């Protein structure tokens, strides 16, 4: 029995180390003690975790039209892809909400025992047409963790390269290591076409960066409890792992699939066979990514099991000149607006003439880089003036013309006194 008179014999909390005189209550267990303060702290932690788990079930899920309208504000064109993504994402999170509400939602009807399967998304289209940006914008609207991974860095377990579990680590990091939050996030895997198997027939030799990666991705796409090394890299038996359930993680996989249009055309009978054989009646414009079928993806090099785990297939199309011009100026965070804000921080108004926007769009089309190349062209055009302006306080505005874009000249710099004279004349 502990003696109460001597400080050395006072009972202490096994967790915080406070003695029984420093706390209101000390509860004894088999060889351990816990004080009332530590019990309160434990209750707070448990309540916070339970609140986080229920968080998604309580938030108001935007309807497909609301998601579509939000995408319209930031992404130019690609209406079919935006519609498909809006519906797929809405159905995915509606499914999670139904699961979190459980039997209360079912209300005793005959659908009680129906379990809704997950619908991951395959996004097909040429580079620079907004595939990644669509996924990023979706995640921002839903306020869920979002991670981007590159399929080309992945290899089968045991070979040099990244394991597929490292993709999940990126999502956990995006959720600030809150696993419950990460389990309801979105993972975007780019360059998925680069892990197609090297030949249409199964190979005898190992294809560690192609078919092997597809096989490794199957389980996490479908839904499994994966063990993720907290520091990334390869697994080894003596390290601790983070356990994450991917059942409610939405996977959006995307790729350019160069050569897929030829496969689609061959299937549809567009191409003739043999020397001098006539071509089919369909023109090249009539068939494209939008006509893709699962059998085309199989011929391209995706394995049947992988295609089966991507039930929603949607496509984006090439961006034409008007679309590129719209991307430059119309969205909420359009490139022109971004650079105008940057110049405004130096007290300068940046002005683009209409023909300058046309010239920038034409250069992007010539380079074949799509929307992704617009920023690079803008940087090239504005670099000289961005170098000079911070050192000059006499400049009120900079005007970019088509000649500046095409020939590499410097934008026209208009001093403050010239602007003041123009205002006085107009007054």
Curated annotation (Swiss-Prot):
In the UniProt record, the gene name given for this protein reads clpX
Entry protein name: ATP-dependent Clp protease ATP-binding subunit ClpX
Q: Which organism is it from?
A: Renibacterium salmoninarum (strain ATCC 33209 / DSM 20767 / JCM 11484 / NBRC 15589 / NCIMB 2235)
Q: Which PANTHER family has this protein been placed in?
A: ATP-DEPENDENT CLP PROTEASE ATP-BINDING SUBUNIT CLPX-LIKE, MITOCHONDRIAL (PTHR48102:SF7), ATP-DEPENDENT CLP PROTEASE ATP-BINDING SUBUNIT CLPX-LIKE, MITOCHONDRIAL-RELATED (PTHR48102)
Self-association and partners: Component of the ClpX-ClpP complex. Forms a hexameric ring that, in the presence of ATP, binds to fourteen ClpP subunits assembled into a disk-like structure with a central cavity, resembling the structure of eukaryotic proteasomes.
Record-linked HAMAP family = ClpX
Keyword set, alphabetical order: ATP-binding, Chaperone, Metal-binding, Nucleotide-binding, Zinc
What family is it from? Belongs to the ClpX chaperone family.
Annotated ATP binding lies at: 126-133
């Amino acid at each position: 029995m502990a003696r109460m008179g001597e400080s050395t014999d006072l009972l202490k909390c096994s967790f915080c180390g406070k003695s029984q005189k420093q706390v209101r209550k000390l509860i004894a267990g088999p060889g351990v003690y816990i004080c009332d303060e530590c019990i309160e702290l434990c209750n707070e932690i448990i309540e916070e975790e339970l609140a986080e788990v229920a968080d998604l079930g309580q938030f108001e899920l935007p309807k497909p039209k609301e998601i579509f309208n939000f995408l319209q504000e930031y992404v130019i064109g690609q209406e079919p892809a935006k519609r498909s993504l809006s519906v797929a994402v809405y159905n995915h999170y509606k499914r999670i909400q139904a699961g979190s509400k459980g039997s209360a939602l079912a209300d005793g009807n005959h659908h009680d025992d129906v379990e809704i399967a997950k619908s991951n998304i395959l996004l097909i289209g040429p580079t620079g047409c907004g595939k990644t940006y669509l996924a990023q914008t979706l995640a921002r609207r839903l306020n869920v963790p979002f991670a981007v991974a590159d399929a080309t860095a992945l290899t089968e377990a045991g070979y040099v390269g990244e394991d597929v579990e490292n993709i999940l680590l990126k999502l956990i990091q995006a959720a600030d290591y809150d696993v419950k939050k990460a389990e309801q996030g979105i993972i975007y895997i780019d360059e998925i076409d680069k892990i197609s198997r090297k030949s249409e027939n199964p190979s005898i030799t190992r294809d560690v960066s192609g078919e092997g990666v597809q096989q490794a991705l199957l389980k996490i796409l479908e839904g499994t409890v994966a063990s993720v090394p907290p520091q990334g890299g390869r697994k080894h038996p003596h390290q601790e792992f983070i356990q994450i359930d991917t059942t409610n993680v939405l996977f959006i996989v995307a790729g350019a699939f160069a050569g897929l249009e030829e496969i689609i055309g061959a299937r549809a009978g567009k191409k003739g066979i043999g020397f001098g054989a006539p071509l089919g009646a369909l023109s090249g414009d009539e068939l494209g990514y939008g006509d893709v079928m699962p059998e085309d993806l199989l011929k391209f090099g995706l394995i049947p099991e992988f295609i089966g785990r991507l039930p929603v297939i949607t496509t984006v199309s090439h961006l034409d000149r008007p679309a590129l011009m719209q991307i430059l100026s119309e969205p909420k965070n359009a490139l022109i607006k971004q650079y105008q804000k940057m110049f405004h921080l130096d007290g300068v108004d940046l002005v683009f003439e209409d023909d300058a926007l046309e010239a920038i769009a034409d250069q992007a089309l010539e380079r074949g880089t799509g929307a992704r190349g617009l920023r690079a062209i803008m940087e090239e055009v504005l670099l000289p003036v961005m170098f000079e302006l911070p050192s000059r306080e006499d400049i009120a505005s900079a005007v970019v013309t088509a000649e500046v874009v095409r020939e590499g000249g410097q934008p026209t710099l208009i001093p403050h006194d010239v602007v003041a004279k123009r205002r006085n004349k107009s007054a």
